[in-house]
Amino acid sequence: MPRAAAFAFSSSLPLEHREEAERILFFNLQQEKMKEGIRAVSKTYGLPKLVVTGEEGAQRLHMTTAKGLAVQTLFVTARGLGADGPVGAIVFTREENALVALYMAVHEDFSATGKFAGEKLMIRMLKELESIARRVRGVEVLKLYLGGETPITKKIRR
């Protein structure tokens, strides 16, 4: 995958990116490192599911959970220099005064040990989620499941 010139954030993806999104979310080589956290989150919130919404010709990919929890997704696509596809995602929900990041995944090339580690994609994704949290009335903290059974809590600065 060529080096990305820019990242774009979106709550859904065009249907043609389904295979790439599934690979990043469900068949990611980095999952083994996070299995304890994934197991804990899925037990409480349900496993993530990629669903198709919209009418034929305008279908989009969204996330939900097996337990039907109301979640939102921050998909990240790389654009430029030949890259135009999903490279990351955060699935999150709101609980009282917190946005809770349930599942996070990045393409292996953009992981901390990938060939594009310098892009710091996970940090960019978390900053974007924090920016979203700042705009939501009543949200005071981010809770991040980063591979453990309990989330890390980060206070939102306004």
Q: What does each model-identified segment do?
A:
Residues 25-29, 33, 78, 125, ...:
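Hydrophobic, Leu/Ile/Phe/Ala-enriched alpha-helical segments that form helix-helix packing faces
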Residues 7-9, 26-27, 75, 92, ...:
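Phenylalanine-focused residue identity feature
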Residues 23-51:
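Helix-loop element at the rim of GNAT/NAT acetyltransferase active sites that forms part
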Residues 1-33:
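Conserved N-terminal entry element of GNAT/NAT acetyltransferase domains
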Residues 1-9, 69-72, 83-88, 137-141, ...:
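Generic structural motif recognizing short loop/turn segments at the entrances and edges of beta-strands
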Residues 12-18, 79-81, 109, 149:
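Generic structural motif
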Residues 40-98:
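A conserved beta-strand-loop-helix scaffold within acyl/acetyltransferase catalytic domains
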Residues 96-157:
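Acyl-donor binding region in acyl/amide transferases
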